[in-house]
Amino acid sequence: MTAVPVKEPMKESLTESLVESLAEHADRLAIHELMYRYARMVDFREWKLFDQVFAADATCDYVSSGGIAGTAREVMDWLDRALAPWPTNLHFVTNLSIDFEAARKSARTTCYFLGPMARGEMGKDQLVISSSGLYVDRVRKQPEGWRIAEREMRMTIMQGSLPEGYAIPD
């Protein structure tokens, strides 16, 4: 069997198409990793990852969970206080959809989250509650990588109840 010769312009076109496709897949993978990094940052209180997750001018809206809206740093500071009484957190992010904008320099993303939290001793007096919903984001490609520029947390399900008299620490 002999190979069919491919004309040079066609080779160039195929190469450019392949390179573009690989670049898009690399961006998609990087955005997936960004969502996982956010979950790790929150669950393990690794706030040093903040600049690897959020753009410097990022905003967040966590009002649907009883939280606040503001700069990402303000909202993450609030979240740190809100989660302080809950030492065990397991964040799951899944079903991520990515719609690129502007020559793949930004994208709109939506993903589901499930966030069980626990306090007390496992098998004894442990209290577990869980919230679920959507993260609706605008992410932006920066020289150092993809970052969340805008995040809206839309809580849609709450399983369990907060303890009576529970208040988020100041």
Residue map of PLM features:
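Short beta-strand edge/turn micro-motifs at domain boundaries
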Residues: T2, R108, S132-G165
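Short, surface-exposed coil-to-beta transition loops
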Residues: H91-V93, S130-Y135
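A solvent-exposed, acidic/Ser-Thr-rich amphipathic alpha-helical stretch
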Residues: W47-P116
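Short, cysteine-centered beta-strand-loop-beta hairpins and adjacent loop/turn segments enriched
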Residues: G115-D125, M158-S161
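Flexible, surface-exposed loop regions and adjacent strand-edge segments
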Residues: A167-P169
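Short beta-strand segments enriched in hydrophobic/aromatic residues
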Residues: V42, F54, F113-G115, E152-M155
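Short, low-complexity N-terminal intrinsically disordered segments enriched in polar/charged residues
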Residues: M1-R40, F44, K48-Q52
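Short, P/G- and charge-enriched loop/turn segments at secondary-structure junctions
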Residues: A82-P85, G123-L127
